[in-house]
Amino acid sequence: MGQAGCKGLCLSLFDYKTEKYVIAKNKKVGLLYRLLQASILAYLVVWVFLIKKGYQDVDTSLQSAVITKVKGVAFTNTSDLGQRIWDVADYVIPAQGENVFFVVTNLIVTPNQRQNVCAENEGIPDGACSKDSDCHAGEAVTAGNGVKTGRCLRRENLARGTCEIFAWCPLETSSRPEEPFLKEAEDFTIFIKNHIRFPKFNFSKSNVMDVKDRSFLKSCHFGPKNHYCPIFRLGSVIRWAGSDFQDIALEGGVIGINIEWNCDLDKAASECHPHYSFSRLDNKLSKSVSSGYNFRFARYYRDAAGVEFRTLMKAYGIRFDVMVNGKAGKFSIIPTIINVGSGVALMGAGAFFCDLVLIYLIKKREFYRDKKYEEVRGLEDSSQEAEDEASGLGLSEQLTSGPGLLGMPEQQELQEPPEAKRGSSSQKGNGSVCPQLLEPHRST
């Protein structure tokens, strides 16, 4: 048995199995199946291949370098600084031209600060006092400007005052100008040079037009039809981001400049264009003290005696973040095969759904279910079922024939001819079956 089973298993390896198809003449289910096929085919062709370009291999590991330059000058005339010209070296931080840069639009200037003793600002809670013991010498003022000296400075007829501190004096004033300090900043220009590379396809490009005429960049400006002149007017960038220049220049803010590269490398390289979008990244909260963007910096000097002093500047301005992202695609047979296979699998899912409708949901589901599925049993089960049917058939014949079939005597009696029955009834008196044979033969 083991050898025969092994031989049968080996021979079964060369068997070919195929499916049996049942054609259901049901127009509703047939129409549903064709609609599913058409929908899946439209999804595969339109969405997967035409819109998502599923036949392409994609590279999203974009390598990018950004160089920025700001140009423009502003003129101011104040009591603290006098007449002054502000150029790029004054209002752009940092000066290296990176992808993140800051343009000063408003200033609070505190000139001629020297290290000395003076009263802490009244708005500092830790600097308030009523007597000298409230000001511990050598203790830094929390959220303040210096170190306490141990003295409490009070104005005339006032019970409370502020601690004397050792700091850069005079202290910075907290008042902010009602108008932007550098109004001309709205007309400054920003030059953004971006180089990108997709390493998988060894494809490189820049957002600057490849021309030898240097005057091109001095006269052109960015526009909807001029993507290869990345020179932006600062006020236009603020407007495209949905903000007002006067508001953001007064308190400061953060603007995002996004450069998107979506390149179809099945086409010419000249068809790969940068796309720009602008947005404000910080949340402008009108009732919040944390709105805006500012920081402090100082410029240090020495007088004739060699004593150091400085000019403190609290700068409000606009921070620009240049962000670059993108992807490149090129035809490849592998994603094409994968997406086509996925579409074929979806076709099978449509057939499965129609099978469920056919055998479970419509009115004639039992009829179609019987036609689709056949019940096949094993050999032993078939033999046992045949024996059961045979025994059941014999029992039914006995029940229909009457009690005579249950024993052999009755059966023989039913099989006797009518003549025998009459002969036996005529000889009941002597019990002899054939009395003539029992008489002796007489000679004559």
UniProtKB/Swiss-Prot annotation:
Extracellular face of the membrane: 52-319
Keywords for the protein's UniProt record, in alphabetical order: Cell membrane, Disulfide bond, Glycoprotein, Ion channel, Ion transport, Ligand-gated ion channel, Membrane, Receptor, Transmembrane, Transmembrane helix, Transport
Gene Ontology cellular-component annotations: plasma membrane; postsynapse
Notes on how activity is controlled: Activated by ATP. Slowly desensitizing. Sensitive to the ATP agonist alpha/beta-methylene-ATP.
Cytoplasmic side: 1-30, 363-444
Catalytic reaction list: Na(+)(in) = Na(+)(out); Ca(2+)(in) = Ca(2+)(out); chloride(in) = chloride(out)
GO molecular function, one term: transmembrane signaling receptor activity
Pfam families assigned to the protein according to its UniProt record, in alphabetical order: P2X_receptor (PF00864)
Region (Disordered), start-end ranges: 378-444
Disulfide bonds, paired cysteine numbers: C118-C169, C129-C152, C135-C163, C220-C229, C263-C272
Tissues where this protein is expressed: Expressed at high levels in brain and immune system.
Signal peptide, first to last residue: none
Sugar-bearing residue positions: N77, N202
GO BP annotation list: calcium ion transmembrane transport; chloride transport; nervous system development; osteoclast maturation; positive regulation of calcium ion import across plasma membrane; positive regulation of calcium ion transport into cytosol; positive regulation of calcium-mediated signaling; regulation of skeletal muscle tissue regeneration
Protein origin, superkingdom: Eukaryota
Transmembrane segments: 31-51, 320-362
Record's subunit section: Functional P2XRs are organized as homomeric and heteromeric trimers. Homotrimer. Forms heterotrimer with P2RX1.
Family under the similarity heading: Belongs to the P2X receptor family.
Domain notes: The second transmembrane domain and the conserved Asp-355 are essential for P2RX5 subunit assembly.
UniProt name for this protein: P2X purinoceptor 5
Phylogenetic placement of the source organism: Eukaryota, Metazoa, Chordata, Craniata, Vertebrata
